[in-house]
Structures are given as C-alpha cells and as structure tokens.
Amino acid sequence: MANVPWAEVCEKFQAALALSRVELHKNPEKEPYKSKYSARALLEEVKALLGPAPEDEDERPEAEDGPGAGDHALGLPAEVVEPEGPVAQRAVRLAVIEFHLGVNHIDTEELSAGEEHLVKCLRLLRRYRLSHDCISLCIQAQNNLGILWSEREEIETAQAYLESSEALYNQYMKEVGSPPLDPTERFLPEEEKLTEQERSKRFEKVYTHNLYYLAQVYQHLEMFEKAAHYCHSTLKRQLEHNAYHPIEWAINAATLSQFYINKLCFMEARHCLSAANVIFGQTGKISATEDTPEAEGEVPELYHQRKGEIARCWIKYCLTLMQNAQLSMQDNIGELDLDKQSELRALRKKELDEEESIRKKAVQFGTGELCDAISAVEEKVSYLRPLDFEEARELFLLGQHYVFEAKEFFQIDGYVTDHIEVVQDHSALFKVLAFFETDMERRCKMHKRRIAMLEPLTVDLNPQYYLLVNRQIQFEIAHAYYDMMDLKVAIADRLRDPDSHIVKKINNLNKSALKYYQLFLDSLRDPNKVFPEHIGEDVLRPAMLAKFRVARLYGKIITADPKKELENLATSLEHYKFIVDYCEKHPEAAQEIEVELELSKEMVSLLPTKMERFRTKMALT
C-alpha cells in the first residue's frame, strides 16, 4: 500500500459504493448484477491494497463467531476499547471492506459467501465493537446476518444476531452516548468527515432497521405482543428521524392496526389507521431518498393497491367494533337486550374518563403539526362500541365509504378473492347494522341489500375453482333470506288477518332460503352425489346449522293443502333426525351445535305426535 496514494484507495472505495447503489433494472437485461460485480472487483482491489488482516484476528476459527458463541461473539463486551495504532486501524478498515463484500454477495444471492465476509468483519471488530469507531459497523454486520439467517428460515439464529445488535446499541448509548463514526468515514478525507448531526442520524437509522427486523422475527415466531411493540417503535422512530417512505410507512401502520383490532384495543387501532391516512396523503410530496430512489408518482399501481389495502383495514375496524358491540348487547337468540344496553350506557362515562388519558400515551405518532393532523382524523371516528342505531350508522357509513374505496382497486377482474372478501365485508356491515335497527321493515331492506350484492357473485364464480368461497356465499345468502323470512313472519303475526300477498312473500323467502341452503349442502357431496358420513371439521358447524334451518324452514311453509303440509312436516322431521343421529355417532359434533341439538331432539319427540294428529284430522275430513 505504500506505493499507492491513500487518496486513490479512497476513490476506489467510493466508486465501489456508487456502483453498489445502481438499481438492477439499470443494468443490461442479461447481466442484472453487472454493477454489483464491478463494485465487488473494486472492493477486492481495496482489500488487497490494505494488506492482510492482523494474524491473531484472521486465524481464529470461524466457529467461535457463530451465534451463541459466548462473550467474545454475540455477548456484551466488558469494556470500551478504541482501535488505536496502525494495526488496529487497518483491522477496522478491512472490516469495512469485508462488510461491503458481504452485503454485495448477499445482493447477488450468494448467501454462503456473504455470510463468510460478514463473519470476518465481526471477527476483525471483536475487541472494538463497543467503540466510537466500530459500533455502527458491528450492528450493521449483525443486522445483515440476522436478515441472511431469516431468509434461510433459521429464525432463532436470526433472532440471536438481532437481539445482540439491540443490546449493543443500548450498552453503547448508556456507556458512551456520542454519535459514532459512520463506516464510510474510514475512506473519507478529514475535510469530508460527517458532522455530529449526520452521524447521529445515520446511527439512529441503523438502530431503527434493527428494530424493524426484530419485529419481523417476532412475528414469524408468533410472539405477537413483542412484534407489535417493535413495529410501533420502528414506525415512531421513522417519523421522529424523518426517515420513511410514505406508502410503506402507511401500510405498516395500517397492518399494525389489525393487531390492535384483534386485541379489541380500538383506540390504538384508530390511531394507527388515522396516522396511516395522514402519512399516505404525503405520497408524492416527499422527494426520493437513498432508501427510495424512485419517486412514488412512478408507481401508480402500487399506490392504488396500498390505498385499497389501507381501506380494507378501516373496513375491518368499523366491522369489528360494531360486531363487538352486538356481542355485548345481544340476548340468547341474537336480539338486542335492552338491559345490557342500559348497563353499557352507564359504563360509557367511566370509559371516557379513564381510557382517553391512559391509553393515548401508549400509542402516539408524530409531534406538532403531524400530531394535530392525525388527531383531526381521529376525532371524526369513534373508538367506543356503538350503543344505538345512530352510533352504529356512523360507523357503518365510514365502513361503506372504505368499501367503495377498496373496490376501486380490488375489482373482480384480476382480484377475484379480494373483491369477494370486500363484498362480504360490505354485506356483514349491513347485517350488523340491522341488529341495531328496531323497525322490522327497514331491517328487511338491509338484508335485501345484502342479497343483491351477494347473488351476482354466485353467477360469476366457477364452483370448480372457487368451491370454498362459493360455499361461504351460498350460506350467507341463505341466512339473509332466512332472516328476512323470520322478520316477515313477525310482521305478519302483528296483523290480525295477513293478506295473501304477505303469505306469498313469506313462502317465496322460505323457498329462496331453502334453495341456497340446499346448494351449500349439495356442495359437500362427493362426486357420486353421496352426502358424507363424516363431515369435515372446517364445515361441521355450518353444515349442521344448514340442516337445522332447512328443517325449520319446511315447518314454516304456509299452505292450505293438508297433504302438502304433512309432506313438509315429514321432511322437517327427517332433517331434525339427521342432526340427532349424526351427533350420536359423532359426539364431538354435539359441542358445535348444543342449542340446535337440544331443539332438534325436542322436535324429533314432538313432530311425530303432531303429524299423527294431522293424519287423524285429514281422515275425519
């Protein structure tokens, strides 16, 4: 190296970095890694010019550097040791080169070689990893090894590297605290060294990446609480350091909302979704960064897709909040329990007094104007369970707004499954809104809207390719007709003398419900059209419910023909008996339909007597 000016070595290194940043699509189609290979060649030249690694660092067995190798590898160092003297300085510069070679090989899908270089980097830094000069490089190397092992699906190994990085960061901030040297500064002239502010920004970004990768690892390990905590920390830090991609940040915040929704933490979910809306609105207003080299305006399809995905998260929020309220207020037959409603009203003030101040501190994104913008979105949406129709309607309208927004991208032509799920959510919004409605005619109209949006899907779908989805839709349409029939019967019961139009309407609804329940049950038959002796666990409850409702529907058909009525009662009895007999042969099924089974047993006992009386009456007339 004595014969080569240091400035030339630095130029080679900077040229290698520039080539490393060239995007793949800018390379020739047949040589997508051309720039990466050119960068690698320059890095190897710099490595050769630096000379061999210090002997005691280079000769140590690699096994010592693996995860779990004790204090000298991933454990925390006992003290801060700065790399002083020419030998130590050369070791650190070589570590920088090994790091970039490692990343280069990973980028070209040569994982084993990439791992080897990253492990060499860590070995060279072993003594100095907590120092001002080396901490950032050490954490970056371990982060990349964490990603590498994660890609190999060795998640526990990835976890060890990433948790070690987190611990190193925390120890450094506690014991040293000053912004550390960025690895690239090893090859910069003194006058081009970074400011303290820029160093701090880069180091905090490295740590933010560490938290982001840990969130992914914990999610993979099904440690969902931890994953949510790290995801939230990542998102918060990205905003604090103004280092985020609006579309990516927004979709991550919306995804985090789903964790809170499943935990029934609706205030936190609302905050995440409101923040997602605000940040997503920045798309195109923020210039590209080194992390996001292309302006977002160049990816309109991704923009519209993410917008649709965020809309779907809002739909889930509205739907789950309404359904949770329904569960809290319904009686044992699924109707509104006024006593429960009154109890929840009494709790409302207490909820407002206690939760607003406590929980708002737990999840909060942004400060100043950003915080105000997020709050402005939040204030338009309730996080409390709706207790009456007006409150439920507000959530319904918000959910429906996002249904229309989601359907703009997720159209049936190209996104069949997604489109159907959005339509099913729309139907579910109408269904749960009907629970809060006291006017039975208006409830009927809501179920009619559900049928109007679901029935066309059964025409568009090929049952051979979309069997499960078809079953879901058939069952849901049947249930909507079933609910409408029950409501029409209740309306007729209030009249002294129902006219023929109402009777015809009830029978038509009955017939439609039977049609779709039968289509659902027929879909369970084998290719020889034989109904299974053992019904699969995934469809057991819906199959039993369908049988029970078919039995009940036959018993509800209104006819003036005694012979036809007797036939209907016999068919009804046949379906009730099926349920009882099946549960006797398969006791596990009884747990799925306890209420329906008891009613079926009762009907199996009562119907034969009723039918016998009917026969006697027919004989006498």
UniProtKB/Swiss-Prot annotation:
Main subcellular localisation: cytoplasm
UniProt-annotated location(s): Cytoplasm, Cytoskeleton
Alphabetical keyword list: Cytoplasm, Cytoskeleton, Developmental protein, Differentiation, Hirschsprung disease, Neurogenesis, Phosphoprotein
Modified residues (Phosphoserine): 178
Disease: Goldberg-Shprintzen syndrome: A disorder characterized by intellectual disability, microcephaly, and dysmorphic facial features. Most patients also have Hirschsprung disease.
Tissues/organs with expression: Highly expressed in heart, brain, ovary, testis, spinal cord and all specific brain regions examined. Moderate expressed at intermediate level in all other adult tissues examined, as well as in fetal liver and brain. Not expressed in blood leukocytes.
Protein name: KIF-binding protein
Location of region: Disordered: 51-75
InterPro entries registered for this protein in UniProt: KBP, TPR-like_helical_dom_sf
GO molecular function: kinesin binding; protein sequestering activity
GO cellular component: cytoskeleton; mitochondrion
Quaternary context: Interacts with KIF1B; positively regulates KIF1B microtubule motor activity. Interacts with STMN2.
Gene expressing this chain: KIFBP
Family as reported in the entry's similarity comment: Belongs to the KIF-binding protein family.
Amino acid composition bias (Acidic residues), ranges on this chain: 54-65
UniProt cross-references to Gene3D superfamilies, sorted A to Z: Tetratricopeptide repeat domain
GO biological process: central nervous system projection neuron axonogenesis; in utero embryonic development; microtubule cytoskeleton organization; mitochondrion transport along microtubule; neuron projection maintenance; transport along microtubule
Short name of one Pfam family: KBP_C
Role, per record: Activator of KIF1B plus-end-directed microtubule motor activity. Required for organization of axonal microtubules, and axonal outgrowth and maintenance during peripheral and central nervous system development.
Highest taxon, organism lineage: Eukaryota
